[in-house]
Amino acid sequence: MKTLTVELGERSYPIFIGQGLLGQAELFKPYVTGTQVLIVSNTTVAPLYLEKAKQAFSGYDVKTVILPDGEQYKNLDVLNQIFDVAIENRFDRKCTFVALGGGVIGDMTGFAAASYQRGVNFIQIPTTLLSQVDSSVGGKTGVNHPKGKNMIGAFHQPECVVIDTDTLNTLEDRELSAGLAEVIKYGLIVDYPFFEWLEQNLPGLLARDPVVLAEAIERSCQNKATIVAKDEKEAGLRALFNLGHTFGHAIEAGMGYGNWLHGEGVSAGMMQAVYLSKLMGDLTQTDQKRIAAILQSAHLPVMPPKEMSVQQFLDLMAGDKKVQAGQIRLVLLKAIGQAYVTGDYPAELLERTLIEYR
């Protein structure tokens, strides 16, 4: 088992990475407050891992909530199902919420924990590659609104993140690829040696080699933990994690939540950001081709959906939560491993990107 730490002073917390961790009850006990535990999962993950999770919290008063699976259910109406169970069972302020699932479950459980009685303890047990390397770490929680992704939410850090890599054995190939988009993102924004390693080890990742997967997860989490420790509330440096996300969120919303997976939208969105970076004179065509090649090798889309118009992109991007004073701020690349955030780009180049890169 590997242990990393997200350094946030008194609110620092560990990330445990290894095989078979879900079966280690003693691992969880130091991070549970009170006697009541609410495990939130979904209809896909619960049949596979809920019983094992309940055993990990044996000795506590455990209740469960099983939500429908999919980004289209990440909304306030479905969120209320978590509150309903907590309130009906008189969960108090000492209770612990546990997220058992992918990014949607983690985001919703975290937001429920941030909101219930003005904030209760919660633990992340991410079961998809995307949630293991990205959404479970850093304390971002929330739900979608019909007019935008993650527009309603809060920063609420978990007590710990437990990454049992065995859960990836049951992950669908499409979900694995979606997670690889976020893994590749770390190489693109801050870690060129990791990008090179990914180019060499992508076959092992796709084959679910446990050693290769564990290293990719560890290096991704370390990159995220380092930046979150410096910029918890996304005042500056942490915004680099949004490479491809402004374009990608527009794709997810425009195509209807759940039709494009988050990682798929991010992949196509990263290529749009790469194209704009090239138009800005920052990124070489060689780098553009390398980035496209690794995403395609990971079975990810490198083009946005043709159904979306330029105006639809612009309208959805203008509603993004990262917009400041009406300015769409984007993460662009100077080179692989060197990202920067800017709103200082010619509007005609953004429009040209949306017209030409499709």
UniProtKB/Swiss-Prot annotation:
Where in the cell? Cytoplasm
What is a single cellular component term in the Gene Ontology annotation? cytoplasm
Where mainly located?
Answer: cytoplasm
Cofactor(s) this protein requires: Co(2+); Zn(2+); NAD(+)
Classify the source by domain of life. Answer: Bacteria
EC category name: lyase
NCBIfam families cross-referenced by the UniProt entry: aroB
- Give the function comment from the record: Catalyzes the conversion of 3-deoxy-D-arabino-heptulosonate 7-phosphate (DAHP) to dehydroquinate (DHQ).
Q: Which family does it belong to?
A: Belongs to the sugar phosphate cyclases superfamily. Dehydroquinate synthase family.
What is the official name of this protein in its record?
Answer: 3-dehydroquinate synthase
What species was this sequence derived from? Hydrogenovibrio crunogenus (strain DSM 25203 / XCL-2)
Taxonomic lineage from the root: Bacteria, Pseudomonadati, Pseudomonadota, Gammaproteobacteria, Thiotrichales
